[in-house]
Regions:
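PLP-dependent aminotransferase class I/II
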Residues: 2-3, 14, 26, 41-48, ...
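Glycine-rich phosphate-binding segment of PLP-dependent enzymes
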Residues: 3-6, 15-37
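Phosphate-binding glycine-rich loop
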Residues: 35-83, 96-101, 107-109, 174
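Short beta-strand-to-turn element immediately C-terminal to the catalytic PLP-Schiff-base lysine
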Residues: 185-186, 200-205, 245
Length: 371
């Protein structure tokens, strides 16, 4: 009798949900019992816990990761007429935040080794209108922050971390969320630390900036019915804060499990047609995404899917070729590295609770591909 083939979804929340079921249900019951749903004790408790985790003084909750970046830019006074340098290889929310603030994104190419922005290319992109560098920690690995901060310091620029994919990642022993002037996090459910809905936050050591961000996310109000800014409604609700607080103590263990899976992939995948990602020496990668590259990416995807292996692409169309950013005037060939990554990248299954059999199935399927 033949064995049943092992299927592997691209992602599954079920193992984590089963393990934390009592904690999550307890968090829900606690919020319901308190009968306070916005700006209460759960929000305050999570903000303190996450600030402590990141090693900073302040955490300000908000509605989602995009809002976190928009609030940072607005609180810094960055807007129309200003430029913000950002990587060409990133999720569109990074650049949308710059647009929503009224500033102009200036896209800089990554390195193929890290997928993150190449600091050697940043200097040439700085102009008199540049006000900040948006450093994205893509796929779970920190950008080269020493070089980025040095360039920013030399030109009087702010450094904003887009840490949406890097909860718990470290750079030279310091956690993402403590490496720039103001980092923004997303707690979208699929993140390494995910809510059970949309949520986000900003972390910072800048007292005045934290105060402005909190006000801007609460209709521009510093206290009830007193509005000092033209703000917006972007707050972390009590229920999501309680869920996040229940999951935070498990984040390091869950990241360690991702690192164990990644270590197996890196050690046991030996297909010359598939380029594996790298963990850089100064970084602790938390493997939000395990991104490989293949010249015939679509054939690899078809091969894996036919064997019950789920995949995804991060991201199939680079920002400068999206219709939303036709205004940048950057046609095909303008940013060749971003275009190469978009054409060749494929994301393999990576989630807490993958069984050894599932990990082995992914490894075997990749090794069997004839590219």
């Amino acid at each position: 009798m033949s064995e049943t083939p092992v299927t592997v979804p691209f992602v599954s929340f079920r193992p984590m949900e089963r393990e934390l079921d009592a904690d999550l249900r307890g968090a829900f019951a606690r919020v319901l019992d308190n009968s306070w749903y916005i700006g209460g004790r759960e929000d305050a408790a999570f903000e303190k816990a996450f600030a402590d985790y990141c090693g900073v003084r302040h955490c300000v909750g908000c509605g989602n990761g995009l809002d976190a970046l928009v609030l940072i830019l607005k609180a810094m006074g960055i807007g129309p007429g200003d430029e913000v340098i950002a990587p060409s290889n990133t999720f569109i929310a990074t650049v949308l935040a710059i647009s929503y603030a009224g500033a102009t994104p200036v896209l800089v190419e990554p390195t193929l080794e890290s997928y993150n922005i190449d600091p050697a290319r940043i200097e040439a992109a700085v102009t008199p209108r540049t006000k900040a560098i948006m450093a994205v920690h893509l796929y779970g690995q920190c950008a080269p922050m020493d070089e980025i901060n040095a360039i920013a310091h030399a030109h009087g620029l702010k450094v904003i971390e887009d840490a949406a994919q890097a909860h718990g990642a470290t750079y030279k022993g310091r956690r993402a969320g403590s490496l720039g002037d103001a980092p923004g996090f997303s707690f979208y459910p699929g993140k390494n630390l995910g809510a059970l809905g949309d949520a986000g936050c900003v972390t910072t050591n800048d007292d005045a900036l934290a105060e402005r961000i909190r006000a801007l996310g609460n209709y521009g109000s510093d206290y009830k019915y007193h509005h000092v800014y033209k703000g917006q409604n972007s707050r972390l609700d009590e229920l999501q804060a309680a869920f996040l607080a229940a999951k935070l103590p498990h984040l390091d263990a869950m990241n360690a499990e991702r690192r164990r899976i990644a270590a197996r992939y890196l050690a046991e995948m030996h297909n010359p047609a598939v380029t594996l990602p790298a963990e850089l020496p100064d970084c602790t990668h938390v493997w939000h995404i395990f991104a490989v590259r293949c010249a015939d990416r679509n054939a690899l995807e078809k091969h894996l899917n036919a064997r019950g292996i789920g995949t995804n692409k991060h991201y199939p169309t680079p920002i400068h070729l999206q219709g939303a950013y036709a205004e940048l005037g950057l046609g095909r060939g303008a940013l060749p590295l971003a275009e190469e990554i978009s054409a060749t990248e494929l994301s393999l299954p990576m989630f807490y609770g993958m069984t050894d059999a599932q990990v082995q199935a992914v490894i075997d399927a990749v090794n069997e591909f004839e590219g």
